[in-house]
Amino acid sequence: MKTVLVTGGAGFIGSNLVRLILAEEPDTRVLTYDLLTYAGNLDNLRNCLEDPRHDFVRGDICDREAVTAVLGSGNISEIIHLAAESHVDRSILGPRGFAETNVLGTVVLLEAAREAGVERFVQVSTDEVYGSLDSDGSFSEESPLVPSSPYSASKAAADHFVEAFGRTFGMEVLITRCSNNYGPCQFPEKLIPLMIRNAMNDKPLPVYGDGLQVRDWIHVSDHSSALLAVLRGGRPGEVYNIGGGNERTNLEVVRSVLRLLGKPESLISHIDDRPGHDRRYAMNSSKIQAELGWQAGVKFEQGLEDTIQWYMDNAGWLDSVATGEYRDFYSAWYSGGRTAG
């Protein structure tokens, strides 16, 4: 029985991926490694913790000794690396933490994986490394990396390290770059769960600038299936873009949330735009579609409706994660000199 290490597996995307692997691959064991920082939550794995094919280890990917011990403990043959600081707003407030976790942590993991003889390493990255697009076109795997934020810069640097380890040491590495995710268990600092939570509580919905920034949205279940497809069939040394084909302006998304919840658009509050805010992202996913036969299956309208229902059904989960640290960040970011427009 082969073992896959999923770093950041108690987070939003990671927990959805862990559940998929356990459901789809009965001969695979999953070891989840997660520090359980503010966005990591064991409750996200509540259906996995009792599975005999799943183990959980709490630890920091920057801790070389701990990472080496984990890789030496379970005959791990494959790694899907999701552990990261991932919120752009937080990276503006504290860039150093993003460099430490996203860059140094990736290097630590690569070094330990190489020494342990790990057969395959999948780096989970983001479309944000490509920077911003005009109104036309889309990012391909050959697009230059032009990150705009400390977050995207840290992910681009990590991607370069992954590629360098592949070229220098012959490691079997792959990189995925995905568009904006949404779905169950997403921490409420991100756009869709933030808007859902505020709308449910009749609080203002803060929208940056004119709200016409465009993002391509993909349901987390589609992203998870793409990651598994890359792990199993991707060509070593390659990059695979993953998009949902659902381009929407932020304002369109916010209005859809309000409409589905039966709330008035008067709750929308335009605030000062975020520094370095990219105007548009769009992904060309033809490579993964042609090579691996993957297709996004969830239509945005249905996925958003299902996501809202999940948050309504799991209001206790939402309240439990949106506690002290989150409230401190929310207050500092949305009240710290940012004004409604």
Predicted regions span which residues?
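Hydrophobic alpha-helix immediately C-terminal to the catalytic Tyr-X-X-X-Lys motif of short-chain
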Residues: 157, 161, 165, 195, ...
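N-terminal Rossmann-like NAD(P)+-binding domain of SDR-like oxidoreductases, especially those catalyzing
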Residues: 1-181, 306, 311-314, 320-341
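A glycine/serine/threonine-rich, flexible loop-to-helix segment
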Residues: 48, 137, 188-196
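Residues that form or flank phosphate/diphosphate-binding pockets in enzymes
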Residues: 13, 39-40, 65, 186, ...
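The catalytic Tyr-centered alpha-helix of NAD(P)H-dependent dehydrogenases
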Residues: 147-154, 184, 188-192, 216-220
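Residue-level recognition of oxygen-bearing side chains
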Residues: 66, 97, 104, 187-191, ...
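C-terminal substrate-binding subdomain of Rossmann-fold SDR/epimerase-dehydratase oxidoreductases
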Residues: 5, 18, 30, 59, ...
